[in-house]
Amino acid sequence: MKSSLKQWRRLALGLILVWALLFLALLSYFMESRVDDPHAAAALSYTDTRRLTSLQGNPRTIMATHLGLATSSAPSTSSNTQQEQSQEENPSADPQPSPLSQEAYPYPDPQSLAAWSAFGTQDVGSRSTGVSRNRERQEYNQDSPQEDEDEEEEVIGGEEEDEEGGDEGRGRTTKRVARHGSSDPHEYYVPRYKSIVHGLWKGSLSMGMLSPRLQRAMKDYLNNNKHGVAYRGHRKAKQSRQQVLCELKKREKIRTLDGAEMPFSKLGWQKIVPALPLSQIHRPGLKTCAVVTSAGAMLHSGLGKEIDSHDAVLRFNTAPTVGYERDVGNKTTIRIINSQILANPMHRFNRSSLYKNVTLVAWDPAPYTLNLHQWYSNPDYNLFTPYMEYRMRFPSQPFYILHPKYIWQLWDVIQANNLENIQPNPPSSGFIGILLMMSLCEEVHVYEYIPSLRQTDLCHYHERYYDAACTLGAYHPLLYEKMLIQRMNIGSEDELKRKGKVTLPGFNKVHCEP
């Protein structure tokens, strides 16, 4: 009896062991089949892998692969060393915005540059190229009113800060995201965008060639007419280079607030503004001058030494030089700033070294009627109080506010040379700066106001923000400004394409009939 019971126990234990082994075998088989299944692996890793590739992949390798080029590996170096050394040597200096490093934006080799220029206008060597291209494609895929109803609502933030030619943003423009698109966006996007850049090179472009988003934004500004513009002048769209230069020369006299007009005379501004007019601070005159825009296409240009070789260099707003010397140089003679820089505490206008040891020229949009009382009581951004405070603290530094009449006269010239109605908003800082330097210099070289082969939707070389409005305009009549500047260009087409460089004669070298 006892032996029989022992046998049953052994049998039960054996069965349990067999079932356990069978269970483990099945579990092992199931797990191996899951690992070997490519669909399961793709489902688990596709999204993360794609994201990591876009962030970590070598951008030159990715672009070369896309274009079918051979690639070579090279160690990347950071451009932050110079900035760190500067901070160590001068701890009290203001921290500069973190530069987009050489690692993030490697300089393209000639082979890549040649292939890229043949392919289109992508930003070769930029880690964010894919982002920019996708945003552009989304924009240009909006070609049907019916499709627009299926998209997210676009938000345009009022005005852009500073469209100086790759530099605009008085409030950011949020692009709408298309929920549709062709299977191959290149078929639509690349030819159209490339034709726009070529149109700028030729000086022949119209609003109808822009993306639907930018067209809608421009029409909104036309309808809004915030500044009460009522242009009654003649339009001469086909004027020659000489005719345009002579027309601008007649209006070129730089005018700044001198404190003699009300309400400024009543406030004692004659004792606040500089005694020496802006037009006379560089007597007997400057030979060659550089206007350096803040456009993202300044990256990889290697134009720093050429820019610094000029007698004077004009820059805009918060554009830094530390960390970007190879591309933009480090000399600054004049800095044009819009009223936001003075009014917004985040720019640290009274303390930042960006605004020291240079000539400052500020401006703010005023009513087209030139009502100075209305402007003083209701400026776009209050620049008057910060200006007075700065002048009292640093009375020896040349600091001027452009007169609204000077700004709107420039706008009148732009409108007079276009049959289309342009945006009824002041010209961009870029256009103002170019005309200012044409009044002060014998020859003016402008960099990346009209885009080169490096054209990208990266708005500023020192910020990671993308929008086609920075190049083509929304708030400012930037598109029409650029066509007018190109009409006056006496430089070569090769320099325009390779360097984004426009050469303009100073007004003292322009000879006009009486």
Swiss-Prot record:
Residues 1-10 are cytoplasmic. It comes from the Eukaryota. It is an enzyme of class 2 (transferase). Belongs to the glycosyltransferase 29 family. Residues 70-92 have a biased composition (Low complexity). It is found in: Golgi apparatus, Golgi stack membrane. Residues 145-166 have a biased composition (Acidic residues). The chain crosses the membrane at residues 11-31. Its EC number is 2.4.3.1. This is Beta-galactoside alpha-2,6-sialyltransferase 2. Glycans are attached at residues 330, 350, 357. Keywords: Disulfide bond, Glycoprotein, Glycosyltransferase, Golgi apparatus, Membrane, Signal-anchor, Transferase, Transmembrane, Transmembrane helix. Disulfide bonds join 246-512, 289-441, 459-470.
